[in-house]
Amino acid sequence: MIIKKNKKIIVAMSGGVDSSVCAWILKKQNYQVEGLFMKNWEEDDQEGYCSSTKDLLDAENICKKLNIYLHKMNFSSEYWEYVFENFLKEYKKGNTPNPDILCNKEIKFNMFLNYSIQELKADYIATGHYARIKKINGKYLLLKGIDTNKDQSYFLYTLNSIQLRKILFPIGHLKKNKVRNIAKKIDLKIAKKKDSTGICFIGPKKLKNFLSLYISEKKGDIVTISGRVIGKHSGVFYYTIGQRQGLGIGGIKGEYNIPWYVVEKNIEKNILIVAQGSYNKHLMSIGLIAKNINWINYDQLSFPLSCMAKTRYRQKDIICKIEYINNHHIKILFDCPVAAVTPGQSVVFYVSDICIGGGIIESRLPLL
């Protein structure tokens, strides 16, 4: 996307490699660049799940080196209200939500975008996402990042055309190794800093341990498809469809020595249902029902619609057909059965490299 050189751009600075190189690229191109560090989580818990102190220090040092001003904003209360409370509510229902997608929707490309444009008088915001924006026939489209291993368009499907007009993804056309090489070349101390992984407010800690701070344990049985009790769980909401680790079962007399996987969660009966093998038929789905659909400037939107889909991040694209149910729901039918389709996660749609939208998985259509 071509923009005039005298424009003011606010870069979301996280203290990491991607946002730092993003700022450097724009600075080198002679734009009026400023940074903004967002604090989205209050660090009053003794476990220290999400300490932003080191990241802020890194962001300050980077901005000093690049000679750009760094703003600081605390969006913790907004994050709690619009992201974290939803996260807990969905887990209590037995779903597995993706707070990073909701954070993009409610915080980064809503609160941060609006603050930058309205209060800081910026023309654009920029982030270090591996995605691209192209203006084609007068419409702004969201595309996958060039680096297929790092593409983050999956997390951005909630964007709309008005937002896309004001967003820049300066590293979307680069591969990760190139970004790190740039960071080394310009002598950034964070050039070897590891990428952030996992849910942003949990960090490297175990999800189950974190959830137990907010959701009380409710012990129950782990049962096989046939109804045989083979173990105990501490709360069905602590587990996700397709989970293998942390079940505490194995070596069951009369059963094959094959790993067990969660295939269903029954909240009402408080039981966790498991089966053996990562591709057992009970884990497979022929499709799903999705809600909260967002479409991004797609001209050929008519049903049934044939396209590609992802039901989780970094999954290979799946051939599918989308059928209209009503204004709030659609049905997705896969060309081949898909494992571990998980309610609460997002399904995102593509035509070639263009992300045309997505929605929340409400339920799966089992193979059986």
Curated annotation (Swiss-Prot):
Keywords: ATP-binding, Cytoplasm, Disulfide bond, Nucleotide-binding, RNA-binding, Transferase, tRNA processing, tRNA-binding. Residues 98-100 are annotated as: Interaction with target base in tRNA. ATP binds at A12, M13, S14, G15, G16, V17, D18, S19, M38, G128. Its main location: cytoplasm. The active site is at C103, C200. Residues 150-152, 312-313 are annotated as: Interaction with tRNA. GO terms for biological process: tRNA wobble position uridine thiolation. The record marks H129, Q345 as: Interaction with tRNA. One of its GO terms (molecular function) is ATP binding. It catalyses: S-sulfanyl-L-cysteinyl-[protein] + uridine(34) in tRNA + AH2 + ATP = 2-thiouridine(34) in tRNA + L-cysteinyl-[protein] + A + AMP + diphosphate + H(+). It is an enzyme of class 2 (transferase). Disulfide bonds join C103-C200. It is found in: Cytoplasm. Its EC number is 2.8.1.13. InterPro entries: MnmA-like, MnmA-like_C, MnmA-like_central, MnmA-like_central_sf, Rossmann-like_a/b/a_fold. GO terms for cellular component: cytoplasm. NCBIfam families: PRK00143.1 (NF001138), trmU (TIGR00420). HAMAP family: tRNA_thiouridyl_MnmA (MF_00144). Catalyzes the 2-thiolation of uridine at the wobble position (U34) of tRNA(Lys), tRNA(Glu) and tRNA(Gln), leading to the formation of s(2)U34, the first step of tRNA-mnm(5)s(2)U34 synthesis. Sulfur is provided by IscS, via a sulfur-relay system. Binds ATP and its substrate tRNAs. PANTHER family: MITOCHONDRIAL TRNA-SPECIFIC 2-THIOURIDYLASE 1, TRNA 5-METHYLAMINOMETHYL-2-THIOURIDYLATE -METHYLTRANSFERASE. Belongs to the MnmA/TRMU family. Interacts with TusE. This is tRNA-specific 2-thiouridylase MnmA. The lineage of its organism: Bacteria, Pseudomonadati, Pseudomonadota, Gammaproteobacteria, Enterobacterales.
